[in-house]
Amino acid sequence: MIALQKSISVSALANMLNDFHSELDQKPVILNYTGKIKNLLSKGDTNVKTEKNELETFILYMAPAKSNSFGVNLCPKASKGCTVACITTSGMMTFTSNILARIRKADFYVNPETRKGFCLQLWKELVNKDRTAKKRGYKVAVRLNGTTDLDFFGILKNQIGKDLFSLTNLVFYDYTKLIGKVVKYQEQIKSGKYFLTFSRSEDNWSDCLAALNMGTNVAVVFGSDSLKPEIFEGFEVIDGDKTDIEMVKVSGKILALRAKGKAKKDRTGFVIW
């Protein structure tokens, strides 16, 4: 582990964290953070794509892969290309304050002494969103894995005995590279309780085919809008950059995404050129 001195400048810290982001192993950074997290969920209108969503959207952003203070991998199937091209390398995600906020939230979850508290706070925030949505007569979209790939439905069930699917005014959606998650939640996916999109990387096409054959959409990153085809590997292509919840409108399709941030320079095969 790498301990940071309290006197380190914010700009130096940002540079170090951005350097760590580009490494597959993502060496952990110890921030010795002991403060409280005011809100785990962020409004989707802070994201260029989610601000176009038809539904009000809330997202949980935490430090991806191993970039938390404990070195625990929160993206267990992240490939080299995925790690380098992570969405945290683009736009507002690169701001130092946002990087630190993601690490604090990840540490709150990863630390065995505070994990239950994390789950209780997340549940409380989601219950409040659900009640507000019911009172106002509309649905609210929630993405719990904005920058991670965890099974929060199982985690909250095991940690505090709460069923996220009981919050019927929330529309849960996510991206994943875990084909086991697609299999596990087939019933909820088919009933419209959970909208899950599988993510292609340079080394998981067989899992992509398995997901497509189950009727699950697969996100594929292309180098530019002009490279997005109408058909990819025999499957219809939908523009996944229109909004962040295009996945709820179709099934068994390819969601074409445009490379952003460091992904624009990817040559690992993660981005298709």
Question: Model-flagged regions — what are they?
Answer:
Residues M1-W273:
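Class I S-adenosyl-L-methionine
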